[in-house]
UniProtKB/Swiss-Prot annotation:
It comes from Paramagnetospirillum magneticum (strain ATCC 700264 / AMB-1). This is Undecaprenyl-diphosphatase 1. GO terms for biological process: cell wall organization; peptidoglycan biosynthetic process; regulation of cell shape; response to antibiotic. Its main location: membrane. One of its GO terms (cellular component) is plasma membrane. Keywords: Antibiotic resistance, Cell inner membrane, Cell membrane, Cell shape, Cell wall biogenesis/degradation, Hydrolase, Membrane, Peptidoglycan synthesis, Transmembrane, Transmembrane helix. InterPro entries: UppP.
Length: 267
């Protein structure tokens, strides 16, 4: 892959992980990149490492609270951080198990047209659920059932175009979560999944190819991490006072654009 292609893929990975679009759906608009397997696995590991670091920096208070909570849980004196950690784990386990089993085949579940249609439908659902959902619940109100349910929904994000952030935020809004709280818990759920994805991919690379650490990988890590941090900060600032409607419109627009590329013979 060229320098520009690495940069574009890293940007898409970083923004797609935190915004309700999904990197797989966005890459459907750039099939010439999606069709280049060389170096993509290593690039994905590097990009996800940067994204994970970005999430940990942005939500450092929650990360610290969960770390302390783990220690207090081991001492038999659970606190808020302990409960938050357990809720995140409850929401992570279903998606982690399924993802570990089918991750390598997930990208073939639908084609470009299917991913485009899913992008459009997801945008419509996000728009509708954001408008219909009341705003009364926060992360502190999370139940075990709610955590496990939202976590299980992440399994659907294995289908290109669904978007892990998109599906969890959409349902959270329908259930009455505050917008920032919906994004926050979605990102907390993402951390162990991103870590698991990176470990699985790295393990496969280590056993089947010779690992080469290059400047391209460092650039991908930095670019994806910075894109994720800026995208997340921007979205959190926006939804503090506004709705998810612009993100829903962008999803719909991306979907229409991909369909146009497919049916006019450019993809």
């Amino acid at each position: 892959m060229t320098f520009l292609e690495v940069l574009v893929v890293a940007l898409i990975q970083g923004l797609g992980e935190v915004l309700p679009f999904g990197a797989a759906g966005l890459l459907a608009a750039l099939p010439h990149l999606a069709a280049k397997p060389e170096g993509r696995a290593a690039l994905s590991v590097a990009a996800h490492a940067g994204i994970l670091l970005a999430l940990m920096i942005y939500f450092w208070r929650d990360v610290l609270a969960m770390a302390v909570g783990l220690w207090r849980l081991a001492k038999g004196k659970p606190d808020y951080g302990s409960h938050l950690l357990l809720h995140v784990l409850a929401g992570t386990i279903p998606a982690a198990i399924v993802g570990w089993l089918v991750l390598d085949r997930a990208s073939t579940l639908v084609g470009q047209s299917g991913a485009a249609i899913i992008l459009i439908l997801g945008g419509v659902l996000l728009w509708g659920c954001d408008k219909l959902g009341v705003t009364v619940r926060r992360v502190e109100h999370m139940s075990w059932v709610g955590a496990a349910g939202l976590g299980a929904l992440q399994i659907l994000s294995l289908v290109p175009g669904v978007s892990r952030t998109g599906i969890t935020v959409t349902v959270a809004r329908l259930l009455g979560w505050e917008r920032q709280a919906a994004v926050r818990f979605s990102m907390l759920l993402a951390m162990p999944l991103i870590l698991g994805h990176g470990v699985k991919t790295f393990w496969g690379l280590a056993h089947h190819t010779e690992l080469v650490f290059s400047s391209d990988l460092l650039m991908a890590m930095a670019t994806a991490g910075l894109a994720a941090l800026i995208g997340l900060a921007g979205m959190m600032a926006w939804v503090a006072r506004n709705t998810f409607v612009p993100f829903a419109i962008l999803r719909i627009g991306f979907g229409i654009a991909v369909l146009g590329l497919v049916y006019f013979g450019q993809a």
